[in-house]
């Protein structure tokens, strides 16, 4: 790559980072417990408007259809093979993330400035999806990451405009199964790209290969403090704990959050599995919660009231072995959970949605002792 291309790329990265800071700035991580429990977790940052997140329960056999194609034709249609629990957005069956009954997780994150989808071909409308349809399609169709790799070859993701955004949603995806197998899916320059080797974390722009290369600048990161050194008879010791992470970027741009997420997951405490691993995941993601400054101040008063606690609309953690979902919302940091294995999907004739905010849970538990 010549110097002019490098400069152009860096300028694009800078501009996209500014764009992401005012809208989507999500962070995704994975941790594995000693018992093999794989936990996939993410924050959902969106300061442009209220996403109205709902915990959604979908029984197998539910019919789905993609958004209408540019020429008015129907897009892909499918029937879910598996039960699904996940977060749908904007009052529609658009999954920001979720897990199916086989322990497969999908998480959608923003990729502005770089996502470019396959060209729409009218004769292939029946296998075409909008970007926001992809998560639901994967959750309904596949049990493992290996199946997803093959299945992606048989669909096309085309630039269908999401009305709330005014453009085709610029996104990429992390897909993880209960064995720990994981891929990152991106559509860049009109072509499908699948990354089979991942670092277990994902943020936003630029594309994934850039983040992997950028990680080479931080190979010195470690959990332990650097030892003292003798310089001309003077003992030069670290100034307190944390010297192993000197140089760790602290801002909220996607490249910096990626490195920070990588550092925190690689230096995380060893967990036993189950809720212990979920607990560590949520603790790590608390480092990525965005403040009120990330919210668009031009929102109407009602939406500003909803988002007054900051741009992180929710945090969710999926235990892929035990099929449990744990979440927090911007209005209430208490952790709530859903046990997919005990929920009676057979009793459903259609999907049900439960608003994640304002559930009957207290902000704090009163532990004042009786006098």
Predicted regions and their residues:
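C-terminus-biased signal that marks the final domain/tail of proteins
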Residues: 24-39, 47, 52-53, 66, ...
């Amino acid at each position: 790559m010549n110097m002019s291309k490098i400069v152009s790329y860096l300028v694009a990265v800078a501009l996209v980072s500014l764009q992401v800071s005012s809208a989507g700035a999500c962070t995704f991580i994975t941790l594995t417990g000693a018992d093999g429990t794989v936990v996939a977790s993410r924050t959902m940052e969106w300061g442009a408007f209220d996403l109205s997140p709902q915990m959604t329960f979908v029984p197998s056999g539910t019919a789905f259809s993609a958004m209408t194609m540019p020429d008015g034709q129907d897009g892909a249609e499918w029937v879910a093979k598996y039960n699904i629990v996940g977060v749908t957005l904007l009052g529609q069956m658009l999954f920001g993330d979720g897990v199916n009954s086989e322990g497969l997780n999908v998480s959608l994150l923003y990729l502005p400035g770089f996502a470019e989808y396959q060209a729409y071909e009218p004769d292939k409308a029946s296998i075409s999806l909008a970007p926001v349809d992809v998560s639901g399609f994967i959750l309904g169709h596949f049990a493992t990451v290996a199946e997803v790799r093959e299945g992606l070859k048989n669909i096309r993701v085309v630039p269908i405009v999401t009305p709330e955004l005014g453009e085709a949603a610029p996104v990429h995806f992390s897909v993880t199964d209960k064995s720990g197998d994981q891929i990152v899916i991106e559509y860049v320059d009109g072509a499908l790209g699948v990354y089979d080797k991942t670092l277990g974390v994902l943020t936003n722009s630029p594309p994934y290969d850039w983040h992997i290369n950028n990680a080479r600048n931080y190979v010195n990161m470690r959990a332990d403090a650097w030892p003292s050194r003798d310089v001309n008879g003077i003992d030069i010791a670290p100034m307190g704990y944390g010297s192993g992470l000197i140089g760790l970027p602290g801002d909220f741009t996607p490249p910096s959050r990626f490195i920070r997420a990588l550092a925190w997951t690689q230096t995380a405490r060893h967990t036993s599995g189950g809720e212990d691993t979920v607990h560590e995941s949520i603790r790590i993601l608390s480092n990525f919660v965005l403040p009120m400054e990330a919210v668009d101040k031009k929102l109407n008063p009602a939406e500003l009231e909803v988002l007054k606690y900051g741009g992180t609309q929710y945090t969710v953690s999926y235990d892929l072995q035990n099929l449990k979902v744990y979440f927090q919302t911007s209005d209430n940091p208490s952790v709530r959970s859903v046990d997919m294995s005990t929920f009676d999907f057979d009793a459903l004739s259609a999907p049900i949605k439960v608003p994640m905010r304002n559930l009957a849970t207290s902000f704090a538990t009163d532990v004042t002792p009786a006098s």
